Amino acid sequence: MQPLRLNSQGIQTQVIELIKPVTARRPPACKAFPACGSCHYQHWQETEVSVWKQTQVKAFLKRANVWPVQMRPLRTVPLNNRRRATFHLKRFADGIVAGFNEREGQQIVTPESCVVLHPDLSALLEKLRNFAAREFPIGSSVDAQVNGLDQGLCV
């Protein structure tokens, strides 16, 4: 590894030589990974993500002096099932940019499709894009928080 620069998560590095791949890694399902900031852990096996999340929760509870006697393993969300997202839309003179903020930045990444989102949320992004193209003045932008509830979408 070669250090490149400091960022909010530590030191950004570049791989110089891969000696042995880590078994916890998998190819990311999304073509926009890692530029898209929506899915940070797609390159991990689901069991590894679950263990990491559980470690984080236990550490938080310990700092709060609340230590569970027993804790069930945390579940991860399978592909096409995420029911919460923040969509970013911006109107330019030549059209709309709609999608997710890039990782570590403010540029909007517009993936062709999102393999993580529930199909209802993916369909809503296209509807929001069409709405913004008709209704937004040039230069305006909006962040749309969306939650998929059992009764429908809450925007």
Question: What residue ranges belong to the model's regions?
Answer:
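Accessory RNA-recognition modules of RNA-modification enzymes
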Residues: 1-155
